[in-house]
Amino acid sequence: MMHTLDAKRMLCPMPVIRTQDKVKTLSAGEILAVTCTDPGALNDIPAWCRINGHKVIGTQRDDDEIIITIEVGDGK
């Protein structure tokens, strides 16, 4: 199932914190699409995923919006 998180207009570290909070509510294998506007999230969210056992399965940049798609792993 695809879940979404709107982290637009949030600055570091809020996109990562909101992503972490949302992932805690999901099960392994579920997909989360995080939409944000902070360019730092392109580095911060994938780094957080690597550390916590999740997988970035896609990134998309559209004007000012960035969408990072994550597959939730076992390591919530």
Predicted regions and their residues:
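Short amphipathic
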Residues: 1-8, 33-35
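A generic structural signal for beta-strand entry/edge sites
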Residues: 2, 31, 63-67
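Short cysteine clusters
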Residues: 12
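Short glycine/serine/threonine-rich phosphate/pyrophosphate-binding segments
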Residues: 15
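Amphipathic, hydrophobic secondary-structure cores in small proteins
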Residues: 18-54
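C-terminal structural segments of small proteins and small subunits
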Residues: 46-76
